[in-house]
Curated annotation (Swiss-Prot):
It comes from the Bacteria. This is Protein YxxE. The gene is yxxE. It holds the Pfam family CdiI_2. InterPro entries: CdiI_2. Disruption phenotype: Deletion of the yxiB-yxiC-yxiD-yxxD-yxxE operon has no visible growth phenotype, however it is out-competed by wild-type cells. It comes from Bacillus subtilis (strain 168).
C-alpha cells in the first residue's frame, strides 16, 4: 500500500469522505457529492485524482490504496479495477461541471 500521510492526502480525504461504509450506494454518494460540493472543490478533485492516477506508483499499489480508502464500495461488483472505477468517477464529475458552465 502507498505510504502516504492519509490525513493530509486529498485523495484519501475524497475517497474516505465520499465512499465510506455508511453510504447507501456508490451512485448515491456521487450524486450527494455533486450536489453538496462547490464547483471549485470538484475542479480541484479532478486535478488531484488525475495526478494520483498518473503518478509513478504501480497500478497494484494504486488499486490497493483506492480499495482501502473507499471502504464503502464493493469494487468487484463493478467488474472494474479500482483505478478504472476512479477514472469513471472523474468522468462523472467532469460531466457535472459541464452543467455549471451553461
Amino acid at each position: 500500500m502507498l505510504l502516504i500521510n492519509k490525513q493530509k492526502d486529498p485523495v484519501f480525504q475524497f475517497l474516505a469522505g465520499t465512499f465510506h461504509q455508511d453510504i447507501e450506494t456508490p451512485d448515491d454518494a456521487i450524486q450527494e457529492l455533486l450536489i453538496e460540493e462547490s464547483k471549485e472543490y470538484l475542479e480541484d478533485a479532478i486535478v488531484f485524482l488525475t495526478d494520483f492516477i498518473e503518478s509513478e506508483h504501480s497500478d497494484n499499489k494504486k488499486n490497493d490504496y483506492i480499495q482501502s480508502c473507499a471502504d464503502g464500495v464493493y469494487l468487484p461488483a463493478f467488474n472494474l479495477e479500482p483505478i478504472d472505477w476512479l477514472k469513471n468517477v472523474i468522468v462523472q464529475i467532469k460531466k457535472s461541471l459541464k452543467k455549471f458552465k451553461r
